[in-house]
Amino acid sequence: MREGERWVVLGPNGSGKTTLLSVASMNLWPTTGSVEVLGERYGRTDARELRRRVGFAGSAIEGAMRPDLTPTTLIMTARHGAFEPWWHVYEDTDRVRARELGARMGLADHLDQPFGTLSAGERRRTSIARALMPDPDILILDEPMASLDLAARELLLADLEALALESRPRAVLVVSHHLEEIPLGFGHALVLAGGRALAAGPCESVLRDDILGEAFGLALTVERHDDRWTARMRRRS
């Protein structure tokens, strides 16, 4: 990914998406090859410091959040990469930023509720606001639309579209199973299958019937209407 680019990673279950994210976020050591993140070579730099420049949000992060803590606290603790508020000292500016990020992600009316009482969409928004707390250079979102209903999905898509227009984070990567979940402003795509990349580049050249059909093992029709992508199985004649 280059500065200013917004990428989507697509592929079926077992294609390697989670493994790729784990390596890119420096939580899994590669068995072969080399990895460079923000100009630093993995293994030749302090991964703990570099991780602070990579924001990560997904269901695994949400599962580690204490249900009795509020979104404000859970967002704020990301300032030090923690989940508990007891081990670090926080300034008033940290609390203000946490509340601003929460409000920006549509949580203004829920910032003081226990996390465990939030809806799936509100939990997802908390996770994303938390990932933005350290002002990362790269933001990685692992299936941000998973388990959301239609309204929650569309509202979150609109927020991610607004985020894509901003200068920070410098690059954003979203992982998904569905073309319908690609936000506007995401202009590049990587398609994985069987642990390898089938295609990578501008969406127009990658999101094609043949490439996605090979990835998912189906005859697909890929279309684009009003800048939103869709894919459906081709009917048998």
What kind of feature is each model-predicted range?
Residues 25:
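Helix-to-loop junction immediately C-terminal to a conserved catalytic motif
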Residues 215-237:
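ABC ATPase nucleotide-binding domains
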Residues 139-143:
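Catalytic Walker B motif of ABC-type/P-loop ATPase nucleotide-binding domains
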Residues 187-202:
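H-loop (His-switch) and adjacent beta-strand-loop-beta switch element
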Residues 33-43, 50:
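Conserved ABC transporter NBD signature motif
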